[in-house]
From Swiss-Prot:
Reactions that this protein is recorded to catalyse: L-valine + NAD(+) + H2O = 3-methyl-2-oxobutanoate + NH4(+) + NADH + H(+)
InterPro entries: Aminoacid_DH-like_N_sf (IPR046346), Glu/Leu/Phe/Val/Trp_DH (IPR006095), Glu/Leu/Phe/Val/Trp_DH_C (IPR006096), Glu/Leu/Phe/Val/Trp_DH_dimer (IPR006097), Glu/Leu/Phe/Val_DH_AS (IPR033524), Glu/Phe/Leu/Val/Trp_DH_bac/arc (IPR016211), NAD(P)-bd_dom_sf (IPR036291)
Entry-linked PANTHER family: LEUCINE DEHYDROGENASE (PTHR42722), VALINE DEHYDROGENASE (PTHR42722:SF1)
Known role: Oxidative deamination of branched-chain amino acids. The catabolism of valine is the major source of fatty acid precursors for macrolide biosynthesis and a vital source of antibiotic precursors.
UniProt record, GO biological process: valine catabolic process
Taxonomic source organism: Streptomyces fradiae (Streptomyces roseoflavus)
PROSITE patterns reported for this sequence: GLFV_DEHYDROGENASE (PS00074)
Residue numbers annotated as active site: 95
UniProt-listed Enzyme Commission number(s): 1.4.1.23
Gene Ontology cellular component terms for the protein in this record: cytoplasm
Full protein name: Valine dehydrogenase
Length: 371
């Protein structure tokens, strides 16, 4: 279903409607949103509500075209369906994108209280079928503003009834996936004595380094922001820094952890990898279909990104229950068992782990539809 969501917006949103009809790919609903007064133009995509209300963040980005924005919303919503299913959450998958610069109006961007509140009203119009949260370009303070118009908002500040920053549990979940990978490959659920390369030590990556150092791993890092590397090395002086990702993937690693941009595993990086395991926090690590087969062909064990980085969505889902950190952490700890189950399914089916993960998620969604 497609909605033209503002009575004066039909001409501006007509192209987006055409794009949606041609690209919808099984999505249940897409809401095309426009508020001319605030400058809001957004897409809310609901991929599946088989397991419950769709849950996924709001991305605020200056897309090169409306087509790119629509496709991103559709792809991200689908990914959230799979992530939520494998995390064992009572939620389907959805995602929203706000089109434009996420900088404040005072800095030449589009972000303003009026725009965020207008967006919140569109989310509210879905009457609980979509629950939103932070994503790229949106932050806890933004969710506080959205929540003034919409009670189906997570990722809020603790002062406003939320759980705050989810990077701590995201990193914890990635660490559990890494422990499971070590168990599957080396027979022990520890990184002690292993060399782990972390690409990106920002919000999630620096917490992951904390876990690795505590576990006894040797850690090598890189980041495009020197200050992020300096912060990590100030906390952990034995951490080694290299100048760029290319240097990192060619280093003598046991585990490679992409924790920055998507597309980290591609036709250039996979042949250069020395690591036996890839397990990181970045979204959409596989640059295109088929990369997972290239990894398997080289004997590299890949822990699917949307499985191991689910700690963040586990946190925001728990926020709907009245956030309890210990309860959410216990749920995120289950990423260890889920990752092992995926590796077992991959061996049984003779497929790469990414394919096995998809099959398990699809099975859970299909079973929910028949109940």
């Amino acid at each position: 279903m497609t909605d033209a969501s503002h009575p004066t917006a039909a001409d501006d949103l007509g192209a987006l409607s055409t794009l949606f009809r041609s690209e919808q790919g099984g999505h249940e609903r897409v809401l095309l949103c426009q508020d001319r007064e605030s400058g809001l133009k957004a897409v809310i995509a609901l991929h599946s509500t088989a397991l419950g209300p769709a849950l996924g963040g709001t991305r605020f980005h200056a897309y090169a075209s409306d087509e790119e924005a629509v496709l991103d919303a559709l792809n991200l919503a689908r990914g959230m369906s799979y992530k939520n299913a494998l995390a064992g959450l009572p939620h389907g998958g959805g995602k929203a994108v706000i089109i434009g610069s996420p900088a404040p109006v005072s800095e030449g961007g589009l972000k303003s209280e009026a725009l965020l509140r207008a967006y919140g009203r569109f989310v509210a119009s879905l009457d609980g079928r979509y629950v939103t949260a932070c994503d790229v370009g949106t932050y806890v303070a933004d969710m506080d503003v959205v929540a003034r118009e919409c009670r189906w908002t997570t990722g809020r500040s603790p002062e406003n009834g939320g759980a705050g920053d989810s990077s701590v549990l995201t990193a914890f979940g990635v660490f559990q996936g890494m422990r499971a990978s070590a168990q599957a490959l080396w027979g022990e659920p520890t990184l002690r004595g292993r060399t782990v390369g972390v690409a990106g030590v920002g919000k999630v990556g620096h917490h992951l380094v904390d876990h690795l150092v505590e576990d006894g791993a040797r850690v090598v890092v890189t980041d495009v922001r020197p200050e992020s590397v300096e912060r990590v090395r100030a906390r952990h002086p034995r951490v080694v820094a290299v100048p760029d990702t290319e240097s990192l993937i060619r280093a003598d690693l046991d585990v490679y952890a992409p924790c920055a941009l998507g597309g980290a595993l591609n036709d250039d990086t996979v042949p250069a990898l020395t690591a036996r395991v890839v397990c990181g926090a970045a979204n959409n690590q596989l640059a295109h279909p088929g990369v997972e087969k290239d990894l398997a062909g080289r004997g590299i064990l890949y822990a699917p990104d949307y499985v191991v980085n689910a700690g963040g969505v586990i946190q925001v889902a728990d926020e709907l229950l009245g956030f309890d950190f210990d309860r959410a952490k216990a749920k995120a700890a289950q990423i260890f068992d889920t990752t092992l189950a995926i590796f077992d399914r991959a061996r049984t089916d003779g497929v790469p782990p990414a394919v096995a993960a998809d099959r398990i998620a699809e099975q859970r969604m299909a079973e929910a539809r028949t109940v």
